[in-house]
Amino acid sequence: RQMCIRDSSADETKGEMDGYVVVLHTNDVHGAISGYAKVAALKKAYEAEGAYVLLMDAGDFCQGDPTVSVSQGKTAVELMNMAGYDVTTLGNHEFDYGYDNLVNLSKEAKFPIVAANVLYQGKVAFNSNQIFTTPSGVKIGVFGLETPETATKAHPAKIKGVTILGGKSMFDCAQAQVDSLKADGCDYIICLGHLGIDKESIGNRSTDLLNVVDGIDVFIDGHSHSTMKDIAEVTDKDGKVNGTLLTSTGTKLASVGVVTISPKGKVTAMSAP
């Protein structure tokens, strides 16, 4: 007698969010390391529902809490590895312990650091961008931008040899990234930026950039510790600036940002406590 064994593996992966892309994002964690367990659990929960999940950070992760500061960011990177981060950009505080330390951290990290406008001796210091492809073939291009304010906020000795493009040079760099990622066949383009929306950052803010750079689907912001409520004050009723969804999620993991891309291409942003 033949036994009929039903293959349930395909059914088990089918969840309510099958075909969805979920981007979980954090920014300005500043050493609030107890929250990383929550982030990891959220990633697993969405994956259990069948979503393709990317976990990103928009900078300032390796300074703040003494545990993280004493280790010069190493503790943060270890915990981010465990939480399953897929890509990050740099914040100005990543340079607090110097460029060489940051290079060492990038080697410890199991995730790429993307920062298209950060140059070392004239060449891109880390990675400009990273492309992720979902099982169904959707391509998501992610590029990073660091605040040019790092040049004045960091001690000169810590950033010797480092150039951070700002203003028009940064805008041109961003547009070149968009054009390159589109040429590579990306269906969605995300900018992971540590720019912020503060008045004192005028000329280098995410909003300034989005008014001149076209083709970014989602801009995940940091630097100004802005919540979604703060962001709503600088966007249109759809949460967009010049057609780009702008989002940010405060500081110290008080909440985690959730960007959802539906199978039909609808992109929405919210935050999870």
What are these regions (language model features)?
Residues 11-273:
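Acidic, metal/ion-coordinating pockets
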Residues 1-5:
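Short, small-residue-biased leader/transition segments that mark boundaries at the very start
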